[in-house]
Amino acid sequence: MKKKLSLLISLSLVAMLLLTGCGSGNSNKKDENVFRVGLEAGYPPFNWTQMDDSNGGVKIDGSAEYAGGYDVEIAKKIADGLGKELVIVKTEWDGLVPALTSGKIDAIIAGMSPTAERKETIDFSNNYYKSQLVMVVKNGGQYTNAKTLADFNGAKVTGQLNTFHYSVIEQIQGVKKLEAMDNFPAMRVALESGVIDAYVSEKPEAVSAQTANSNFKMIELEDGFVTNPEDTETAVGIKKGSELTAKINEILSGISQEEQTEIMSNAIKNQPAAQ
């Protein structure tokens, strides 16, 4: 009786292992057919959240919402070039690099700059957009006619947490550098309510801000911030040593600067008004 029971248990274990193996095989095969991209979906015009698939929006994984914007359009082109299905994984800014290194996502396409500090942890593709740093202020306010960094002496200024936007604020003489904020929607609210006088941004986001809300104004500085060239570039974040890097670079090389400009112009035009 004991022998029969042992045999039954052994057979059951073998069956379970076989089923588990089959399940894992199918799961891996499925994963091979998708390209999982992490982004905030809260940094227009690079990326935002919307309620439907209008203007090329892509459904956010595990959500009823969709993501749209410049990054999403670039992600679609890369996914097509790889022959994979695009899956958007909405991720907080601080969680993007950990999500990539842990394998939760395959790439970061989130308006991220390939800074030297980030390159210590992850690899980057060639850039897919180049920009410049600007300031966003309240239209008609104290700093609406500012032209140089010196004009922001005494101003309450902030930038996004864990970005070089925040670190360059120290280049403004006499500035009141406030605590960094989690995201751009929060900075826009703070600016409109008077909590801050200005925030540091890249030009596409600033154009997006003043397009969405006439209470905001972009200031292009005559005597601007000193930055490294890579700081104002935008590139795809990829896991260290990944074979995806070369493939993504090849796909990006087929997107001309004129096409980049057109995609960005459409993103600014199509962004949800609330963002």
Where are these regions (language model features)?
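C-terminal motif of bacterial Sec signal peptides marking the signal peptidase cleavage site
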Residues: 17-21
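Bilobed "Venus flytrap"/periplasmic-binding protein-like clamshell domains
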Residues: 44, 64-80, 112, 134-188, ...
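Periplasmic-binding protein-like
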Residues: 41, 130-139, 211-252, 270-275
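Extracytoplasmic small-molecule ligand-binding "clamshell" domains
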Residues: 29-112
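Bacterial N-terminal signal peptides that target proteins for export
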Residues: 1-9
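A ligand-binding cleft/hinge motif common to bilobed small-molecule-binding domains
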Residues: 95, 111-121, 168-171, 192-193, ...
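Extended ligand-binding regions for polar small-molecule ligands
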Residues: 23, 72-81, 163, 229-273
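Acidic, polar ligand-binding/catalytic clefts
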Residues: 85-151, 226-227
